Amino acid sequence: MFRLKATFFRAADLAKRYVVLALLLFCVATVGAPLHAQTSTTAEIAGSVIDPVGAAIPNARVVLTNADTRASTAITTDGQGFYRFSLLKPGNYSVSASAAGFQTATHNAIATLGSSVTANLGLSIASQQESIEVNSGAADIQTENADLETSINATQISVLPNPGNDLSAVALTSPGVVMNTTGGATFGGGNYEFFGLPSNSNVFTYDGANDNDPYFNINNTGATNLSLGLNDVQETSVVTNGYSGQYGGLAGASINYVSKSGTNTFHGNAEYWWNGRALNANNYFLSQQGAPRQFVNANQYVTSLGGPIKKDKAFFFVDYEGIRLVIPSLLSVNLPTQQFENAVISNLNSVSPTSVPFYNNLFGLWNGTPGIARAQNTLPGGGCSNVTALAGTTFGASNPCALQLQGGTSQPTNDYLIVGRYDQNIGNNDKLFVRVQHESGQQATYTDPINPAFDAQSSQPEWQTQVSETHSFGTNKVNNLVASMQWYSALFNITNP
């Protein structure tokens, strides 16, 4: 695999003109797809504020600030000195607490997807104006529940070995997962099972909205049967053994993705991968028949850019991904021998002369198969089944009815994905984001080894959109309203009708 990578950053002072978004959607129900409990698809920071002797400080002012966007939310502690910030986007935060007669204390915390971070703040008696700062990272051990959870951030995702950059492949890092290769109703292939449950028992969410395949209820894929969008993901969590009501729906794993968003600094990346015939050995079976290496060409690329529209207020992020490939399919083809064709035509001339033109056309297709000269007599009994004699000719292992050819044929497949996200801090109590995703591709659904006239393709467009508004009520209540929609189509047709 050949790979090029470039990452670029620009200073925050390059913020562009302010764009006013005249859209505020309040929605109770999801449009088109179910939503899942935000406790599993967001983060949480909670803790207590205490004085030097460990007594709770009620009504202390606690301010949470996002380190990337400087968005802040203020609440007050309850009668036991406890506070909680829920429905948070994973990221870096600072929590500061203040109260009359005490020094200000600040706790820097990293909130990961699906986690509840404890950030206790101890306030000292104010002898002079000063502040105390405490740092903490993500918890190593989950103490809130018995769920088995694996969290992977964007940096870890970027270095994870992942041919094809399949978004769903990050779940393979979790305990209890087994690649499903049994096929059947859910294809096998890139899907997986957790603790013996079927591969269609898993729930996939994107920013809290359902992202399962609408027909097979497995991971949602495009024309290449890969889940594009890995470059758009900020963090992923995989929850197993999650039988509490917040996960709902299915008993398998809950695989949750959170998308990237713009910040106060411009940031982005560009990467390119290539794989081709020069990097791959010949297939064993083709080599045995003296066939050359088949043409292979795979090009994959991603690029993204995010930043401020108005510093501390409005942000954008766009991601574009694409893959174009030609990969041969290895197939075994049984071809009639010339002796068998002659015997069939001779017999038809005697019993059904009107059928001769049809069979001549049929045999003509077989005789035009690429690589037919390499076909070998490897079928049991010469491939004759119960045919022993026809039109005076005896058939069997020494005079076969059919020869077998190991062939590799191909046609191009392509897929691309474009994502746009807009975030806005609407005062201290409201935060809004709108995300739109479009994917489109052309799949080589069937490649015929005999004649390309029988090739089939499938056009597979998809649209997803989501609007999310988070509102804080007073000092101790928060609500998140989400509307999402998913539209998918798979149109199958013959390449050469």
Residue ranges and their predicted role:
Residues 50, 65-67, 98, 195, ...:
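A generic structural motif
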Residues 52, 67-69, 100-102, 275, ...:
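Short coil/turn motifs at secondary-structure junctions
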